[in-house]
Amino acid sequence: MPIKLQKLPAAVRWGLAVLCAAVCGVLWAYYWRVFFGLDNRVSPLVVTLGCAAFLEVCLLAGYCVRRFAKGFAAKGAVCIFLCGLLFAFANPPLQTPDEADHYLRTYAISTGHFDFDASRTYPDDVAYLLEAFPGAWVNAHTSAGVGTDPDTGAEKAYNTAGYALKQYGKDGAVQSMADSFALYLAHDVRDSVPDPVSEPVSFLVIPFLPGAVGMALARLLGFGALGCLYGGRIVNLLAYTLLCALALAKAERYRPAFAAIMLLPMSLFMGSSLSYDATLLGCYYLMLALLTRREWNTQTVGIYTAACIFVNIAKPYLNLLWVLPIFLVAKREWHAKGRRPLWALGGFGGAMAVTLLTEWYGTAFRYNYPMIERQGGSTVNGGEQLAFVLRNPLRTIAAFWGTLGENDFFIGQLGLFGWKDLPISFLNLTGPLVLLLAALLAAAQPKHADAFPTRRRVGGAALLALVYAAGAMAAMYITYTPVGMVRIVGLQARYFLCVWLALLPALAVLLRKTICPAITEEKAEAAITPLCACYAIFGAVLLFQHYFVGPVYVVYA
């Protein structure tokens, strides 16, 4: 007769879990050693003990969350922060999009420089860091050519794009991100001095303040450039976590969808970086969470307006769309001081004010910068591109649709990391399935019989998502894409994370009406956090694996 685990004493259950974690760690290490030839690079004992210890620590963390964190929001926040820490260290330095520029601007702010001076240089330690870890590391180390297959003697083309590790010949040394760490850590004994690094073409201050606080604390503790990077990442992650915790606490419905999006590897990858996307995504998630509240009081609309104004500091103009959802709140649900049009007007005015103030500040306190050329070169011209779009609307629609199709509608690129140069196939394939699972659990039977949010809220949020997605594509097409090009340059999956979150409640409503899931809301919320946390941990492991362990591309030159 099978033994039911629920009837076993808690100590026995956790003891079995510890044993299973140790066994899985040994098997995991064995897989790495066999499939990626890790024995030639690292001691088998170190790999085995490391994998087993890692899983035991994860199990201990899971026990502590289950034992001490009270409530859905608290459990979710702790899981977000702990899983984000894994991404902060699994992701090599400066490998988030534009993180090199973000690092330099954040570092300058952390030293008390709130202006922008192109003649100001950084310490040699920072220059060594940027030399060892170029942005888009995988692309920077990609090689292509024609070699000779030693087994057949035939010529064979090779291209290492998408591979962080490569090996020249069967017996050659494996080149990986570990070499960059070795290069940076050995800079004290090197004779050469790197070229000086000056301030980047980046003129924002407020979005980089959390990371700057982390860097300042790291410097006070005696850390160098690399330690400052991780200190900035951790405090940025803390800011992301706090915003997500507030969103989970304020959301009254569809909380499994929010937890799933917040714990997506792509969200944690950005949230644990030096990018201002950490706070930007947190504010997006918070505003959407507030739309699930039945009644809006002054505090609710105040938080929403503050988040709306902040996102317009980091990403101006397009984010003015976030003023409109205030009108999705019906009059009978509005209990704030002041009427909806006044709050919407105040939000719009505040957003425009901070946008114009940010632009003025970035110009007034900018020194010694030469003429700043357009990104993309002389072929990019916003005015000409806009005129081209207006003259050729059908061609523009075709370009938009073709770009979406070529990029798997960006829902199939939730595992594309680095500077879009490190694809992880497993996460690309399973990302949409995780979102579907989130929608299914969000479609659980509500605690109360009356349906809320209303169709007005859910449908309005979905419409906002589609308009926002089209606006993001149009903005990149006009400002970054050469005139008349049939593809949009610069679009990334991270731009659409808030879009998927806004669409999930609409999908949940559809699923509830078609398949009527029997699971209750309490059980759905209890299941989503551990499931998505495990997925996030696995995502962090895969990110580390692809940079440091394998797969290895063997080049026969």
Predicted regions and their residues:
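Specific aromatic-rich, kink-prone transmembrane helix
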Residues: 246, 279-296, 503-506
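Perimembrane helix-loop-helix junctions
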Residues: 290-299, 321-352
